[in-house]
């Protein structure tokens, strides 16, 4: 009987160790962020956001579960925006236009992503 309990405990322990819920998934990669935000390029230069843009913003927002996720996404956005002409004041408007909370920060070259609020 004790042997069965030990085996059962080991089996449950292995299941718990091997189970990786979403909250433990890695932060989104910059390639993922770029693909998600690609439909928003027009918005960042003055147009209205498309449905695809808002869907992407909502998906990206849902992937930013931890401060590390938010910092990673912010740094990716900073890197991506180096290569396009855009109005950094429009970035936070994505949240309003697409109905997303929390707000996206105004990302520019001077933003220290590590100091974003929790």
From Swiss-Prot:
Single GO molecular-function term?
Answer: lipid binding
Q: Which UniProt keywords apply?
A: Allergen, Disulfide bond, Lipid-binding, Signal, Transport
CDD domains of this UniProt entry? nsLTP1 (cd01960)
Query: Is Transport given among the entry's keywords?
Result: yes
Top-rank lineage group of the source organism: Eukaryota
**Annotated S-S bridges:** 30-76, 40-53, 54-98, 74-113
Q: Which Gene3D superfamilies match?
A: Plant lipid-transfer and hydrophobic proteins
Query: Which stretch is the leader sequence?
Result: 1-25
Q: Name one GO biological process term.
A: lipid transport
Record-linked Pfam families: Tryp_alpha_amyl
Q: Report if keyword DNA-binding is assigned.
A: no
Name the protein family. Belongs to the plant LTP family.
Q: What does this protein do?
A: Plant non-specific lipid-transfer proteins transfer phospholipids as well as galactolipids across membranes. May play a role in wax or cutin deposition in the cell walls of expanding epidermal cells and certain secretory tissues.
- Name of the protein in its database record: Non-specific lipid-transfer protein
Organism, as annotated: Ambrosia artemisiifolia (Common ragweed)
